[in-house]
Amino acid sequence: MAAERVFISPAKYVQGKNVITKIANYLEGIGNKTVVIADEIVWKIAGHTIVNELKKGNIAAEEVVFSGEASRNEVERIANIARKAEAAIVIGVGGGKTLDTAKAVADELDAYIVIVPTAASTDAPTSALSVIYSDDGVFESYRFYKKNPDLVLVDTKIIANAPPRLLASGIADALATWVEARSVIKSGGKTMAGGIPTIAAEAIAEKCEQTLFKYGKLAYESVKAKVVTPALEAVVEANTLLSGLGFESGGLAAAHAIHNGFTALEGEIHHLTHGEKVAFGTLVQLALEEHSQQEIERYIELYLSLDLPVTLEDIKLKDASREDILKVAKAATAEGETIHNAFNVTADDVADAIFAADQYAKAYKEKHRK
């Protein structure tokens, strides 16, 4: 008996300039008590605007300052505040950890969840999972939910004013979507959605990649100028919606496993963003598979145009020994890691691919960057 095809997605996705000013319209009839979660910086950027708009729509808002860590203690602390406020709606505003915490709080309360990302830096906003850390920021577990967010609200004016590095990181995270989904589909592997990929997820993942190669560089320059352009709108949708649906229902493989493998090492690498590490992981996955030089160099060229890392030196591992890289490879091939969705490889194979990807990128840089 073949496995079931499963596709999951948020109930509603809204993207555009100044959409946070319409938040009350989207919540009409759902509830009149909310809890709004944002960190101190994001309160200034978007939090207060959201609360003011809710009040105009006769919706009460309990304001919570997020501590900075998506930990069980923080989830419990905010869930207690939300219970006392009798909140039927949880609104998370900000970056990945804030949004992951908001999802967990809504799950505790069985509440309606609204996600408002302030950067297009990862594909996490649309997903039905959170990454939970210890209070000290050490990865603990994935927490899966029975449903995706009820509403994802992406204000491109806010995204255009976020640091360009965050958009580039989101593009890197999203570029892994098709590379990974394609390999999971080919091998008949499982996805985060709990089944095999659908034709819909395959089409979305492929369109994600096409959009990023077409508009990625233009969107990056738009954010440098702090302006909203058609190219930025296209890339924000690719980074957030297309990549979010594509990774969850299309499948994760080696690129994200290698990203997770890097946690086995200490040092400067941890100052890199999620997407920056995934960029290198994607090159490693391409090196693990049979791809032409032209195909691999297409990715290297786009990464370099977005100031993304492509070599071990770029990800602060210039002096890493084979022993160090084997540690990464062993962690990337640990039981339950996503690499097994698409590959039957050993840690040794992965270590070889890491050194190969590094060499391919170094050679490309020498040839083209003089």
From Swiss-Prot:
Entry's Gene Ontology cellular component terms: cytosol
Top enzyme category: oxidoreductase
Pfam families, per database record: Fe-ADH (PF00465)
Cofactor note: Binds 1 zinc ion per subunit.
Binding site for Zn(2+): D173, H256, H274
Biological-process GO terms, alphabetical: anaerobic glycerol catabolic process
Residues annotated to bind glycerol: D123, D173, H256
Protein name per Swiss-Prot or TrEMBL: Glycerol dehydrogenase
Organism: Geobacillus stearothermophilus
